[in-house]
Amino acid sequence: MIAIIAEKPSVGQDIARVVGATEKMDGYITGNGYMVTWALGHLVSLALPGTYGYTRTTAEDLPMIPEPFRLVPRQIRTDRGMVTDIAAGKQLKIIDEVFSKCDSIIVATDAGREGELIFRWIYSYLGYTKPFRRLWISSLTDEAIREGMANLREGSGYDSLYAAADSRAKADWLVGMNASRALATASGSANNSIGRVQTPTLAMICARFKENRNFVSTPYWQLHIALKKDDVHRQFFHPEDFRDKNGAEAAYRRITSDSVVTINKVERKTVFQQAPLLYDLTALQKDCNIHHDLSADKTLSIAQSLYEKKLVSYPRTGSRYIPEDVMAHVPALLEKVITMPWFREYGRTFDLSGLNTRSVDATKVTDHHALIVTGVVPEGLSEAEAVVYEMIAGRMLEAFSPRCEKESLKMECVCEGMDFRSQSAVIVNPGWRAVFSRKEDREKDEPEGNGGTAVFAEGEEIPVMGYGLAQKKTLPRPLYTEATLLTAMENCGKEIADGQAREAVKELGIGTPATRAAIITTLFKRDYIERSGKSIRPTEKGLYLYESVKGMMVADAELTGTWEKALAQIEGHTLDPESFMLSIREYTGKVTGEILRLKFPEPSSRAFTCPKCKTGNVIVKAKVAKCDHEGCGLLVFRRFLNKELTDQHLEQLFSSGSTRLIKGVKGKKGASFDAAVAFDADVNLKLSFPKPKGGKGK
């Protein structure tokens, strides 16, 4: 018998059907010489500090460096603390039973770092040494599964992939556990957590927020003239802004004495805008956030669902290219795409015989090629699934369409010795831009005036029809959205305009395409950041943590980027995992020491009278606040729904009976709203909503 292990039940069932295993058992399917089982995501994890004897950590215990790390069944948080997940424990026993009855194993977990880690940790925890081979496929269609089963790869070929995943997990444990406990020790509060990747990301968000909030706007003035001849009129702008009002007004008075100007330069040329590359996960997440307001995590979840429905290729890819052998299938795929309702209009003129090959480059393909559709006809999709599928299919059409051809026009004139310029462009042949024909794309090309690219002649004298002096003001860089934050994570916070330079720095980015959404989601879940419209801003709790660690190594985005590069080198066989772990241990020691040296103000000695018994005092601890009077029983958990009650929240609650308005509270059904947390008549926590403004309409 041969065991096959997938990452989740739905994938296991698909594989079982293809290989002819039909007899369903508890946790696996058997038949035709196969036993197909599955994980439920990460069934095994690294043990928590308590397993190593670190229960009440003091400064002397830090840093905690387990030697060796231990693996345990997945743990979940309960009122009794962390306990083994019953479902995980049960499935591990089933996998153990399946493996014990088989001679060899086929690994069919997702073909990437996390998928490899899921299997290897199960394999190691259960103590197996049986040979295994890898099913490495980029889609879950029956054809792809059959082809993959016919071309299984040796498991040892993925040892470096496992080493990178294992090293990343251990690095995250070392930095996160030690830094968080160091901060708790230094501050006397266990209400904050620090992560190797999450904290630099939070630091970028907080730094941008503070820069935006503290920005002092300054005025400046722009000078322009309006020229008109027949039906053609253009606005010409002076190329330099005026920072001084008196100077701007003097220049304005000067030019108003000139009623005719001479056009001294006319430059018209054809320019081409390249078709965009195919999507990798991050590019898809950015566009879905920009155009459809989908979060990075939601986009990933939908893309994963489309993958499991066999509609798109593996979504957690970091490549925007495909190799030549995949390109051979593209014409047939596009032939199906242009029959879909979204693209029928564009498909009428689309030429399948001369496809753009900019996205074809095997040297730039990593573990998986770019995101493409599989050709399976989409049916029964939810509204959100249809949106993401349309984005992926539409990007395929864009990527293989001709370049966009524009006609660019630049004109210059002199008015009273001052230069003025006009610049515009019109689309001659939209090429790829006709796929979606987005309004914002068209607006970028509207000329300053009218008349298309009709021009004044060089040397021609044109009457001035108007003069303008517009006062404007400098604006701060905007708060991050999820789309711009993903770009910042790719570039380690650097503002990089040049495309080639941006590609080069990607290997130094924060996180990977597969993990960035989870990093952002973690910051939301831990109440460090919140949404304000489409923007992201830090919470009071997030700003407090940022102010505590800013300038430290643990908040340094570029330093975190070097660790990501090192993990990629492990995967690429150019760095020894043990060398990486040695460096991480040293880094952990430095980070821990840095945090332990922090000086925090003494906790407020203000005591709150218990609102329940009116006799005892409320003692505020890391996870609860409770009355010290025997028999009272007042107990307030700091975690309420999805929010962590900060010290300020508790002070408001015990002083006035209610906190101020807290943004982004999530109810039990997942709906998000703004509400205060207050005491009810029995001194239990409840939600309190602001009264609506104004009276009722008639």
Language-model segment annotations:
Residues 1-3, 110-111, 188-191, 268-277, ...:
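Conserved short loop/turn motifs at secondary-structure junctions
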Residues 87, 93, 100-101, 140-227, ...:
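C-terminal or mid-to-C-terminal helical accessory/interaction module adjacent to the motor/catalytic core
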Residues 243-279, 285:
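Metal- or metallocofactor-binding catalytic centers and their adjacent structured scaffolds
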Residues 9-16, 33-36, 40, 59-62, ...:
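Amphipathic alpha-helical transducer elements in NTP-driven molecular machines
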Residues 2, 88, 125, 180, ...:
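Basic, low-complexity terminal or inter-domain segments flanking catalytic cores
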Residues 1-169, 173-175, 350, 476:
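Intrinsically disordered, low-complexity regulatory segments
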Residues 17-23, 38, 47-48, 54-56, ...:
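Accessory interaction regions appended to the cores of large information-processing enzymes
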